[in-house]
A protein has these predicted regions:
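Small-molecule kinase domains that catalyze NTP-dependent phosphoryl transfer to phosphate-bearing small molecules
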Residues: 84, 93-164
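P-loop (Walker A) phosphate-binding loop of NTP-binding proteins
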Residues: 8
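ATP-binding Walker
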Residues: 11
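Walker A/P-loop
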Residues: 14
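Conserved substrate/cofactor phosphate-moiety recognition/catalytic segment
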Residues: 17-58
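Glycine-rich phosphate-binding loop used to anchor ATP phosphates in small-molecule kinases
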Residues: 47-98
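Hydrophobic anchor at the beta1->P-loop junction of P-loop NTPases
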Residues: 5
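Walker A (P-loop) ATP-phosphate-binding motif of ABC ATPase nucleotide-binding domains
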Residues: 2
Length: 164
């Protein structure tokens, strides 16, 4: 089972993915920022976004081919990026209207070494404004989430996904 959690920066994708992965048996989890860091690729141009989507798809397909479920959390701002990923289950976090960097994400990035930008610049980054502008509402989400879920709601979502 290939699960995509998408939404604007700061919408809670990583928060949900981490908790959901704990409640789905034999489930891997890939976070877009971790993959970008490992790849040293912070290019948010159309080409950079396509490379990132391809990387996420490659990791996810590897896990599925080895009999595991996988959760990938990344913005996936366009319908094309979501279709290319080919999720079995798509969760859209519709929790904010404009992308932003939350305090925890800033602290995580500040701990990273050799980033090609200043972390403080992310709060006003054009990349996030561009992401907000280009984000297309998912047409085929299996689940639309508009607020943070309780632990019980996450467990129920995990059961729902496993029964698909």
């Amino acid at each position: 089972m290939k699960i995509l959690i998408c939404g604007l920066p700061g919408s809670g994708k990583t928060w949900l993915a981490k908790r959901l992965a704990d409640d789905i048996e034999n489930c891997a989890w890939y976070n877009a920022d971790v993959i970008r860091t490992a790849s040293n690729d912070w290019d948010f141009s159309a080409e950079g976004r396509a490379r990132q989507a391809n990387r996420m798809t490659t990791f996810a397909d590897f896990e599925v081919s080895n009999g595991r479920s996988v959760i990938c959390d990344f913005v996936a701002p366009t319908e094309h990026s979501r279709i290319s990923f080919k999720p079995d289950y798509l969760i859209w976090l519709d929790t904010i209207k404009e992308g932003r960097v939350v305090k925890e994400k800033k602290e995580e990035l500040e701990a990273a070494k050799d980033l090609p930008f200043e972390v403080e610049s992310l709060e006003i980054s054009e990349a996030f404004k561009d992401t907000t502008k280009m984000f297309e509402t998912p047409n085929n989400a299996n689940k639309v989430i508009k607020s943070f879920l309780s632990d019980e709601e996450i467990k129920n979502l995990a059961l729902e996904i496993q029964n698909v």
